[in-house]
Regions:
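Conserved redox-cofactor binding core of oxidoreductases
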Residues: 133-239, 492
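FAD cofactor-binding and catalytic pocket of flavoenzymes
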Residues: 93, 131, 298-443, 496, ...
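N-terminal Rossmann-like FAD-binding beta1-loop-alpha1 element of flavoenzymes
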Residues: 26-56
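Glycine-rich loop(s) and the adjacent beta-strand/alpha-helix scaffold that form part
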Residues: 45-54, 58-72, 213, 229, ...
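Extreme N-terminal leader/targeting segments of oxidoreductases
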Residues: 1-27, 45-51, 561, 565-584
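A glycine-rich dinucleotide-binding beta-alpha-beta segment and adjacent secondary-structure elements
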Residues: 204-207, 245, 417-425, 429, ...
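Redox-cofactor-proximal catalytic regions of oxidoreductases
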Residues: 75-156, 424
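Glycine-rich phosphate/pyrophosphate-binding beta-alpha loops
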Residues: 104, 113, 533-545
Length: 584
């Protein structure tokens, strides 16, 4: 449904009618993920005189609570592509890596797994991070974001079956699974501090297809209403394609407004300042496309792409109940599996006394309700690699139980004895973004090239560790089929990073420590910023949205200080060639 349809149905909407837009703003924020929502909220709320006019543009549609797809047909119908530009879920397939992300007001916060976690301090000591951006510097901004997003652990985390299953491997290596801080509401039943109605989490497990309960603390529940209540204008279904630097100062945005799946119109808007926060795929694409139209940029733009070391695997049909079947709004019946809890609740960190590049984080996952039946059928066919002998009869019975069409949520089925894992590690962040030029699209389409990405040794080590998890649960091991079964070593990531990395100067980064975009001569473009995951110059080994939030909180604060008279420092144009050689 489009914004117009939702308004006709009487739903409260954050977005404004497109016809009410102005022609010129002080600030235009492109994208409504953690970067765009936070920047707009902080700037709109700041005590500034005169108060700047702020416009936030989002290419996707608005998804009020209760409108998220929860059946496999509606989930598949909400895939974003050329014929469905307002779809919620986007799966981008490149030669070496595929990317899973969301599209809508609130960005990927609508469909992520909620985990708010701070990386190791050593991550920021990598040579590709600016020396002024350390974990200690960012800690106050982490705290600021965590407070607004209301991050905290599940109150019964250690009682959940999937967390106890994580512990079966953890104790073998002398550690334990620990509850993660997640941005999920477990207490508020009514209006939250930002005036938005919420309900407590029901443990339904549908976080990554969209929370229809209203318990997930997406940006739709906090930063976006903060921005709107403070005067920012929000427009959805509005895709920015490229930006133009105006001769007299300021910027012109070129894009298309999508009225529905079949109707769109081109538009331009002008602004003194533009904040690109369209994500690690789209912000670099906008800048690269703008370069084609004459914008001078750093030679580093389009480099440093990382999948955050993401990797997936399964321990299928083991000896213990795991309760990983999502229910959505369905009510569990007597004798059925217990609801799983949020998509991710716990983790095991492999960080003790090992080099940074060998550290990994393993997290539990659940199956959202729309995928339960398909997962049962698919994994029964794959079966996987048996890790222990003597349990074949019990496994056959559990697989048979899963084929019961009248009782899809049987607690004694194979899928409810399965663990689904997300792992994050340190990849080499050497992906590059380029443009192909098909005949039907004059500016081309962006591609990501990263030869040998999936053949990095860390992914083989992760695969072996997940096999050990499966053995600890007396399960069959199923690796990521794209990586293992077809032997392509193709990666899949839900956490794209880089492409417009932070750097000390224009030869080491595409933007400076405050997200100001470098020109090709070493200066910064006045009034052009990036605030999203594309700034992150390395893998983090943990879920990245809290780091993106902290970087944006810092960038927004510094921008407000500049508006109050505390000028930005001059960019460093004195580049050490020896430093460049050392980093090559």
């Amino acid at each position: 449904m489009t914004a117009t349809t939702l308004r006709k149905e009487g739903l409260n909407m954050l977005g404004s009618d497109w016809g009410n837009r102005k022609k010129t703003y002080d600030y235009i924020t492109v994208g409504s993920g953690y970067g765009g929502a936070i920047f707009a909220a902080r700037l709109a709320s700041a005590k500034l005189a005169p108060k700047p006019s702020i416009c936030l543009l989002e290419r996707g549609r608005e998804w009020p609570v209760g409108t998220f797809p929860d059946r496999i047909d509606t989930v598949l119908g909400a895939q974003r592509n050329d014929t469905n530009p307002l779809g919620l879920y986007e799966f981008l397939n490149y030669k070496d890596i595929s990317v899973i992300k969301g599209s809508g007001l609130g960005g990927t916060s609508l469909v992520n797994a909620n985990v708010a976690i701070i990386p190791d301090a050593e991550v920021f000591q990598k040579t590709n991070w600016p020396r002024t951006v350390t974990r200690d510097v960012l800690l106050p901004y982490y705290a600021r974001a965590r407070q607004i997003l209301a991050a905290g652990p599940h109150p019964r985390a250690m009682q959940l079956a999937k967390v106890q299953a994580m512990d079966r491997r953890a104790v073998e290596i002398g550690t334990q699974a620990y509850p993660l801080n997640i941005v999920v509401n477990f207490g508020v039943d009514g209006k939250n501090p930002h005036g938005v109605e919420q309900k407590p989490c029901t443990d339904c497990g549908d976080c990554v297809t969209g929370c229809n309960v209203g318990a997930k603390n997406t940006l739709y529940m906090n930063y976006l209403p903060i921005a709107q209540n403070a005067g920012a204008e929000i427009y959805t279904q509005t895709k920015v394609e490229w930006i133009e630097k105006l001769a007299g100062g300021g910027w012109r945005i070129h894009g298309r407004h999508v009225a529905d799946d079949l109707t769109s119109e081109s538009f331009t808007l002008d602004a003194k300042n533009v904040v690109l926060s369209a994500g690690a795929i789209n912000s670099p694409e906008i800048l690269l496309r703008s370069e084609m139209h004459g914008l001078s940029v750093s030679p580093v733009l389009g480099t440093g792409f990382s999948g955050n070391g993401d990797f997936f695997g399964l321990a299928y049909n083991g000896a213990w109940v795991t309760n990983v079947l999502g229910y959505g709004l369905k009510t569990p019946q007597a004798g059925e599996a217990i609801p799983p809890g949020p998509t991710i609740v716990s983790a095991i960190s492999y960080n003790g006394n090992v080099p940074l590049e060998d550290r990994i984080t393993v997290e539990d996952l659940s199956f959202p309700s729309a995928y339960v039946l398909g997962a049962k059928a698919g994994f029964a066919l794959l079966r996987g690699e048996d890790t222990v002998a003597g349990n074949e009869a019990a496994q056959r019975q559990r697989t048979l139980n899963d084929s019961d069409p009248l009782h899809p949520y049987r607690a004694d089925g194979a899928l409810n004895h399965t663990m689904f894992y997300l792992v994050m590690a340190h990849d080499d962040a050497r992906g590059t973004m380029t443009f192909d030029a098909p005949w039907y699209e004059s500016d081309g389409r962006m591609n990501i090239e990263w030869d040998g990405a999936g053949r990095e040794i860390i992914f083989t080590r992760i695969n072996e560790e997940l096999r050990r998890h499966a053995r600890a649960l007396q399960s069959n091991f199923i690796a990521n089929p794209l990586w293992d079964i077809f032997k392509t070593r193709h990666l899949v990531t839900a956490h794209p990073l880089g492409g417009c990395p932070l750097g000390e100067d224009y030869l080491h980064g595409a933007a400076d420590e405050f997200g100001r975009v470098f020109s090709g001569d070493g200066s910064v473009h006045e009034g052009l910023f990036v605030c999203d995951g594309s700034l992150v110059p390395s893998a983090l080994n943990v879920n990245p949205f809290l780091t993106i939030s902290a970087l944006t909180e810092r960038t927004a604060e510094r921008n407000i200080q500049a508006l109050q008279g505390n000028a930005y420092p001059q960019p460093n144009k004195s580049v050490s060639l020896s430093t460049i050689d050392a980093m090559a």
